[in-house]
Amino acid sequence: MSFAPEPSFSHGKPPAASCATAILLCNLGTPDAPTAPALRRYLAEFLSDPRVVEIPRPIWWLILHGIILRLRPKKSATKYASIWTPEGSPLKVWTQKQALMLRGYLGARGHTVEVRYAMRYGNPSIASQLNQLKADGATRILILPAYPQYSGTTTASVFDAVYSWAARVRRIPEFRFVNNYHDDPGYISALAERVRTHWRHYGQAGQLVMSFHGVPERTLKLGDPYHCECHKTARLLAEKLGLGKDRYKVTFQSRFGKAKWLEPYTEPTLIRMAQAGIERVDVVCPGFTGDCLETLEEIAMEARHAFLKAGGKEFHYIECLNDSPTWIAALAEFSARQLAGWPTQAPRDTEALRKSGERALAMGAPR
């Protein structure tokens, strides 16, 4: 097995990066454009991940390439086109802004840390960003998934991508991995502020629906903690908002395929609520830290249409955390705790570096 070539190294010189400690904020991914060809590439990568679809590979390959990649890209492209912005995909836009703001907030706290973002599927890839961080001199990297709740289908897949990259590298940086932050007080407070802000502007509905991304039910039975962590997030958020159990519902969206997923499903729940005479509903998606296709199109458009068609009168979608200062401050505080013990504040000792370089050259180092 051959390993990737190492970046050039000179004794006694600091790395190109401002600090050897870095954070890689990892999100799910997005196509490069709202077109069928771009969606075909994206879906092929996404749906080929065994963490996402746990079906024997030969059988799934036939289904994926024989049916799904022939039919789904065009339909998905239309959905993406409905939410695409001049800046590009909302998910990518928000993730990029969060990374930039996180670096700034950490800097304001005295932490000199490089922060980049990457996508598990699509661009910029996790491997490409790790390559760049390594080339810039990062020797300690915190892997920070944009998923508050752990799932083997998302968080573990990010870790897989990091492990895969490391398997091809000779000199591996030191890594730390964040599993979850579903019950982090700062995250819960940021969610509560988002909801309260919406209520101040538009009033408060009698029911708050908390919609999380769904996963196959069998993953729960096989030991995935995602379902439990979603419910804990919902409970803590409800408590922060002062809502009793009869004032909120937890639902799961984005079901794919015919297998049973975590229930209750979001859209059927909203339809039943409208049919039961509930005229207004507020919907928030706590598991998504940035607005994306699943929130802007599936909830704010499709679910809204279903609720109103079933007899509802008012549907309010509460936007994700996005670039909320309260959220970024909470993320910075959480990240700082995860970085504890790593040097992020000490100034670089240039004199020590110079002497180290002189010793290395005296012992025969080429540079």
From Swiss-Prot:
Annotated binding of Fe cation, by residue: 213, 294
Source superkingdom: Bacteria
Localization in the cell: Cytoplasm
Reaction equations catalysed: heme b + 2 H(+) = protoporphyrin IX + Fe(2+)
Record-linked InterPro entries: Ferrochelatase, Ferrochelatase_AS, Ferrochelatase_C, Ferrochelatase_N
Keyword entries, A-Z: Cytoplasm, Heme biosynthesis, Iron, Lyase, Metal-binding, Porphyrin biosynthesis
Function: Catalyzes the ferrous insertion into protoporphyrin IX.
Membership in a protein family: Belongs to the ferrochelatase family.
Name the UniProt record assigns to this protein: Ferrochelatase
Annotated organism of origin: Polaromonas sp. (strain JS666 / ATCC BAA-500)
